Amino acid sequence: EVKTSNGWNRGNMSPEAVKECFYSLEIPEAVSGYAMQLKPLSIPGKRMYKGYQIKYTDTGFWKVFSFRFLTGKPFTQADFDSGITQAVVSESVARKLYGTTDVVGKTVIIDLTTYTVCGVVKDVSRAADTAFGDVWVPYTTDRILMTNTSSENMAGWFSICLLAKDSRDFEAIRHELLKQIERYNGMKQDAKINFFENPITRFDIAIGSIGQRKVDVKDYLLETGSLLLFLLLVPALNLLGVTQSAVQKRRAEMGVRKAFGATYGVLVRQILYENSVITLIGGLVGLLLSLLLLPVCKDSLLQSRDT
């Protein structure tokens, strides 16, 4: 959030804020600023009207996340600093454009700007929403992203991801960031930037935390645990009813077996064994169906938060 005397701007940050507040951090192992835009791709003689996720980022992105390069390599710091139009594309995009992954040195046109492909990476799962993209390019190549800012050049289009050397460094990183924020705010006349609870971890995000509000683990376990127990109660009651119905149908059989010397413990163990087998078979069938349906439904199930 950026506050001024005229109001506040709650959203992403500018390239200047990325540089002054985050690139100057010394405790994290790697820092990366990025912005995402949905744009069509084209090559000479072929235009693709479908929107692809273009990730505008820096060289730190390749340190924060581990990509498998099939050919080529990521753009360099020199490319980034000079605004050289280099691009890393995903395997599926390379095949869509040229029918092969051997496309290093070939061109791709993004928003009327021609980029040279410097690397091809294995497709990234949509579940990895921050790392996911179709094309990755230096954000210094996009003039609009670099200049379209507000609130004394504090607010813009960018987000940040950090890689800590150790989980014990989280608090130290937050304290170091507060010092950088104080220094940066001192450079401005009126505007003041504030990141609230940020940076937050992937675990924090998974339990529902956002930049303005951090969810406590105890509260999450209490709320989510209560909901899960309620949801599990329904199938548990159904299973109990099925078991009781099966026992009622076999009362005569159990009476005969008990008359021939079967103990109560033997009868109970048999019932538990039979129901466990049925439950196991049902679980395996459900797992198999999930594995079969996931490739078909992955586009709708794993939509990126950026789209």
Where are these predicted regions, by residue range?
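Conserved beta-strand->loop/alpha-helix structural units within folded catalytic cores of enzymes
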Residues: 108, 237-238, 274
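Hydrophobic alpha-helical transmembrane segments of multi-pass inner-membrane transport and secretion
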Residues: 1, 215-252, 280
